[in-house]
Structure formats: structure tokens, C-alpha cells
Amino acid sequence: MAISNAEAVVGRHCRLLRPVRDHEGRTRFSEKPKVLREVNNLERRMLLVQFDDGATTFLFPDEVVVEN
């Protein structure tokens, strides 16, 4: 993902590149979650995303493709 500022990705939907688990332990893959915020944790860039049912999880930028 080659987007440099947080405002460019916040509020946009993304496509998952591999199955991921949300905070409730459910496996997600075919959904397109919305990016809520971008955070840096221990020098790692992460995206907090929210699925249609309200569940959230943190993902690394290489796990998603942010859509226009």
C-alpha cells in the first residue's frame, strides 16, 4: 500500500488479501471493511478496520488493498 498520509485511507473500504480474525475470533475474508484509523505501534504501521457487523480488528497494510 503506497499511501503516505492517514487521511488518505481513513474512511475508505479495503479488500482483504488473506483470511484474518476479528477481535471476537471470527475468520473474515470476503468482506470489505472500512478503515477507521491508522496507528503506529512499536514502529509498525497498522490499520484499525471495522466490518459491516461492527466488529473491529487491527491489520497490517500488506494484508489489505485500500480501494478508491
What residue ranges belong to the model's regions?
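Basic/aromatic-rich interaction segments and small domains that mediate binding to polyanionic partners
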Residues: 2-4, 10-68
